[in-house]
């Protein structure tokens, strides 16, 4: 219920002109929502050369038509390649290329100086927009459970087959995806009772800010 509120706020902030802080943070949150990245930490970026949404550098992205292509090294040294399609986010990325500095997600302060966004900025924005103490990590746990739910909803699936696309989307191992991201109720349902559950499943219609699978998971 808080997610549609956040997504409406993202649409509003990303529609603004200029490179204000709220628009830049909204761009990061949109990327978290769409691509399920880790939020990023500057310490890991400098010491381990591993990156998340807030620490992405210009060299990590390219624009191919209407897609934003990301190629970067994530946690545990895993090389990731992602394609993201979003009109407002693409418009922002085109604009931010003109700023000095290596960081992809920057804003202009009151003096006109370019400043990078950090994880604290992102988590504060999410909590304020959703009116609850949610953080960037919740996008990964939510996204993981939505993917797992979809596997269950669309046909008989083994536990291994349910977890595989989650691990792929998150850039995690199947073991970590199961332990730390997928809701335990979905794990239990996959092991026992999925056929009976599926026979009574009626997915709601999608709304502007929630997909059918998201609404089904909430229900």
Residue ranges and their predicted role:
Residues 2, 6-24, 28-51, 55-219:
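Extended accessory and catalytic-adjacent subdomains in large enzymes
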């Amino acid at each position: 219920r808080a997610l549609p509120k956040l997504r409406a706020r993202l649409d509003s902030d990303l529609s603004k002109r200029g490179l204000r802080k709220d628009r830049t943070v909204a761009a990061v949150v949109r990327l978290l929502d769409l691509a399920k990245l880790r939020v990023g930490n500057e310490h890991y970026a400098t010491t381990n050369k591993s990156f998340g949404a807030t620490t992405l550098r210009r060299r990590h992205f390219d624009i191919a038509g209407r897609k934003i292509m990301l190629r970067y090294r994530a946690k545990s040294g895993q090389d990731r390649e992602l394609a993201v399609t979003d009109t407002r986010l693409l418009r922002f990325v085109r604009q931010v290329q003109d700023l000095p500095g290596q960081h992809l997600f920057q804003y202009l302060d009151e003096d006109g100086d370019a400043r990078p966004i950090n994880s604290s900025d992102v988590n504060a924005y999410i909590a304020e927009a959703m009116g609850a103490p949610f953080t960037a990590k919740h996008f990964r746990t939510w996204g993981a459970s939505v993917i797992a739910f979809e596997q269950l909803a669309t046909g008989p699936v083994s536990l291994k087959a349910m977890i595989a696309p989650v691990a792929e989307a998150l850039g995690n191992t199947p073991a970590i995806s199961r332990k730390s991201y997928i809701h335990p109720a979905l794990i239990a349902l996959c092991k026992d009772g999925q056929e009976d559950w599926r026979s009574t499943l009626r997915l709601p219609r999608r709304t502007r800010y929630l997909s059918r699978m998201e609404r089904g998971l909430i229900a």
